[in-house]
Design a protein with these regions (language model features):
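Short helix-loop "hinge" at the ATP-lid/N-box region of the Bergerat-fold HATPase_c
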Residues: 87-88
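Short alpha-helical Gxxx[C/S/T] motif in the catalytic ATP-binding
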Residues: 148, 153, 157
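Short conserved segment of the HATPase_c
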Residues: 124-138
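A conserved beta-strand-to-alpha-helix junction within the catalytic ATP-binding
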Residues: 27-45, 54, 77
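Helix-loop junction within the histidine kinase core
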Residues: 17-28
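Short alpha-helical segment of the dimerization/phosphotransfer core of two-component systems
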Residues: 1-6
Length: 186
């Protein structure tokens, strides 16, 4: 368990350093949104199964009006993985994580995608929510040890959302769960 935690911590630190060092270029490439979502969700479903957490994907490929998009699929995948990994990590066995994607036309050239992730995990206190996106922030030592958290997941997500020109919102209640909504233009 300790080696898994250390590996996760090192990977998160490397990810954050990489994001800090990279000069984000907004070179857009064409990509298939369904492929990105399926990859992220397949990997998370495996993690959730190992932990006995239900992982519900609340969309079908047919629900996606705009599948072929232009943007940065690598950063999108990193964003969705960071948020859904956190949800699985902080949800106790027997709990549930639900992810979704909704789309709407922003204008003649852009599509707004709303990616959501909700869990019935441990949640956060009202006082802590303001610090949730800070690097290495954790509500208490129990989070760090019991859930093997590094306090980087949401700070990584916020950094990537900024690169993608989107916004991220967080709602949480201690003992009830957390919902993260990311709106990204493509």
């Amino acid at each position: 368990e300790s080696s898994k935690y250390l590996l996760s911590l090192v990977n998160n630190i490397l990810e954050m350093n990489k994001l800090e060092a990279e000069e984000y270029t907004d070179k857009e490439i064409s990509f298939n949104l369904a492929d990105v979502l399926n990859q992220v969700n397949t990997d998370r479903q495996i993690l959730a199964e190992k932990k006995n957490v239900s992982y519900i994907v609340d969309w079908e490929n047919s629900d996606l009006t705009y599948v072929n998009l232009s943007g940065n699929p690598v950063y999108l995948e990193r964003l969705l993985a960071a948020v859904s990994d956190n949800a699985v990590k902080f949800t106790n066995p027997g709990g549930c994580v639900k992810v979704w994607c909704k789309q709407k036309k922003a204008d003649n050239e852009h599509v707004l995608c709303e990616f959501g992730c909700a869990d019935n995990g441990i949640g956060m206190s009202e006082e802590f929510i303001g610090h949730a996106f800070e690097m290495f922030s954790q509500e208490n030592q129990t989070s760090r040890t019991q859930y093997e958290g590094s306090g980087l997941g949401l700070s990584i997500a916020k950094k990537i959302v900024g690169y993608l020109g989107g916004k991220i919102e967080l709602e949480s209640r201690k003992g009830v769960g957390t919902t993260v909504i990311m709106t990204v233009p493509f």
